[in-house]
Amino acid sequence: MYVLRMPRPREFEPEAVLNQAMLRFWERGYRATSIEDLVKATGVKPGSIYSAFPGGKRALFLKSLERYSKLVVPQKLGELEAPSASLAELRGYFDGLVRDLLSPEGRQGCLLVNTAIENAAGDDEAAAVVRGHLARLERCMATALRNARSQGEVRASVDPEGGAKLLVATCQGLMVVGKANPDEAVLRAIADNAFAVLA
């Protein structure tokens, strides 16, 4: 007689596991986070992690990057993502970035930027997520600069696309500097000098 074996119901919520894994990767990075760390952070056994996320640690990491892009990035961008964003929203984004970098929690930086530094060069899928984030940020900044130019808030000769690339690079540099030297005067000077080029 054939006995149908029903799969055991999951004893955890994958979304909750993903959130905890994202926080652990964000705090420690990919290489420094072991399966044991993930088990401790999520409370889920290794076999269950591999069952829910085929590919194990790396699959969970890639899902964590996507989760970060979906949940955390919109909070960081805030009004900068609005089609009407202009110079005030650009400055507000940088002010928020500096505030974050000066806080104990903010010292861990951005999961996507950390990934770019740590292992994007050797992981095409991770690099694709990082590139998507940078392109999103660049589009937001280009729109804001375009609006700022039409409103006379920056020089008429400013190229929105080129200016956006400069500001995106400044953001990434700020995050790296902020991790090593969280000095408010230094961080604000970096941001102010980038905007001075556009004034």
Per-region residue spans from a language model:
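C-terminal peripheral helix-coil segments that are non-catalytic and often amphipathic
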Residues: 1-5, 95-99, 135-151, 161, ...
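Helix-turn-helix
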Residues: 5, 16, 20-63
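Short, basic, alpha-helical segments at the C-terminal edge of helix-turn-helix-like DNA-binding modules
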Residues: 66-71
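Hydrophobic alpha-helical connector segments
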Residues: 76-108, 160-167
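Short, solvent-exposed amphipathic helices
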Residues: 78, 125-136, 140-143
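Amphipathic alpha-helical segments used for helix-helix packing
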Residues: 89-90, 104-125
